[in-house]
Amino acid sequence: RAPNAAEGVASWYGPGFAGRLTANGERFDPAAPTMAHPRLPFDTLVRVSNPENGRSIVLRVNDRGPYVEPRIADVSYGAAQQLGFVQNGLVVAELEVLG
């Protein structure tokens, strides 16, 4: 695996947080292509892939979290829809930092 890649459990958050401020001061939009990560700098672009179905999406880090072990990312509801794991709630995802 490349040094800019990671694999781990991802979750999603959405409608209940709509309009609330994210850690970087933006208002959360559940449909936006954004994600929370515990350490990556804000505005970092990350390709998140679901190896179960081959889908991937590029997301922008604008929030902090998740705060539940062993999760490594929390994606927006819209991103989870595109990745195909809304019903499951969790997925073992691959993350690739693009810049």
Predicted regions: what is each one?
Residues 1-99:
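Secreted/periplasmic proteins
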